[in-house]
């Protein structure tokens, strides 16, 4: 459990007058025990509502300072200092005064401000909905008092059952997954309402989380210029892949894992879940006014695995770019070849590579490969590493065989971080590591450097 220790300090003239403080009004200092105790208790209502936290414009450094400057509606100001150890709130004050309501108000407003996540800056019209209130209630829990002393009050943030639930990260994430996105690196929670506007970048550690193909199209392609291709192409079951012989009498449907479902059933499930027909979207559009052909793989659709339809769509895109003399971009996010299609999926590696050979060698056109996390298997072994320029996202997981497969096959430990983009960049595997927020501008400059220019003068 964590403890938040609060030492309240005053620095306002009015409070100094009312509390009888002898400390200088121009400096910070702890509240000293005074005989004017009733004056604080009787006037306690003026602190029942804290309007805002000062210095909200610098929220990135807000938590690192560990000191909160708080002002209420009557312009009475004071600061709160805390250090996190356990999930128990402890208010440590140096007097007999009844500061409990004041500090409780501060805690309440701070938690609300964290749930809002810069709502006062991003959207002044932001209002709480029922789901937000549920999360706030869950975080705050039932406030109860523990053992009291002359110098310290302990406020427990949750009861026993809530503590057990809070420690269960899986239950917490599942319960509120419609509101939060959990970072895979630091396990911090990102508020989903503003997660897309932050390009799926963790606000706690800066890690680049997975992004859907539709979001990437919106990020890279100029508005109103996207023209999809081959949207009606869907996968069949060419080898009639069925992992198990289903017995409707003996098999409990609840115990049926998604990996054991028939291939067609899994395809239908992912199509309904993602709204996509396959694990890649292909089409044409403009980047800063420059016409491009682009294919974007989607890891949410069967792990971005490359089957016969994925290979065919990418091959047709390359052939179209070859005929139209367009620059080509392929954004890779894949677990490799799709095992449910056997050798047909492996054939796509050679087919795509052959089309790229004609595009790059014979026609002398420009292909940019963008490797996102994860890029593994057959995609890494084929078109993922064939770009004229190869760009990787920060901290992307890029490999041919995964860490678990290598360790089980070779019975040796894979060094931590040896399959990260930064490590591989030092070994010369990529041309550049580009953050997501700079990617569009970098692509525009690369295209212009290689002789591809905007269609209009105001295309930049």
From Swiss-Prot:
Domain of life of the organism encoding this protein: Eukaryota
Keywords: ATP-binding, Chloroplast, Fatty acid biosynthesis, Fatty acid metabolism, Lipid biosynthesis, Lipid metabolism, Metal-binding, Nucleotide-binding, Plastid, Transferase, Zinc, Zinc-finger
Residue intervals of the CoA carboxyltransferase N-terminal domain: 179-460
GO molecular function, one term: acetyl-CoA carboxylase activity
Catalysed transformations (reactions): N(6)-carboxybiotinyl-L-lysyl-[protein] + acetyl-CoA = N(6)-biotinyl-L-lysyl-[protein] + malonyl-CoA
Pathway(s): Lipid metabolism; malonyl-CoA biosynthesis; malonyl-CoA from acetyl-CoA: step 1/1
Gene Ontology biological process terms in this record: fatty acid biosynthetic process; malonyl-CoA biosynthetic process
Residues involved in Zn(2+) binding: 183, 186, 202, 205
Cofactor: Zn(2+)
UniProt record similarity statement: Belongs to the AccD/PCCB family.
Purpose of the protein: Component of the acetyl coenzyme A carboxylase (ACC) complex. Biotin carboxylase (BC) catalyzes the carboxylation of biotin on its carrier protein (BCCP) and then the CO(2) group is transferred by the transcarboxylase to acetyl-CoA to form malonyl-CoA.
NCBIfam families: accD (TIGR00515)
HAMAP family attached to this UniProt entry: AcetylCoA_CT_beta
Protein's name according to its UniProt entry: Acetyl-coenzyme A carboxylase carboxyl transferase subunit beta, chloroplastic
Organism: Cicer arietinum
Gene that encodes it: accD
